[in-house]
Amino acid sequence: MDTQFINIGFGNIVSANRVVTIVSPESAPIKRIINDGRERGQLIDATYGRRTRAVIITDSNHVILSSIQPETVANRFLFNKDD
């Protein structure tokens, strides 16, 4: 299996093979997932102090915060899958 990566902003990359979902952080359940990830020590903040616009959840239950739109991350994900 070929390892592919997704740029999630500011030079940060995530393994495309490990991504389970890419969601917006606006809803209460996603905010709970973010807080749970923080408590478990599995939260990765890749926003560089900017507003969180996308939450990426991996198969290892890591929660990754990104400051780019979920649609942009998803488009990069789909573009990488086509290669």
Swiss-Prot record:
Annotated signal peptide: none
Pfam families linked: RemA-like
Family of the protein in this entry: Belongs to the RemA family.
Entry-linked NCBIfam families: MtxBflmRegRemA, PRK04323.1
Stated name of the protein: Putative regulatory protein Tery_2835
Species this chain originates from: Trichodesmium erythraeum (strain IMS101)
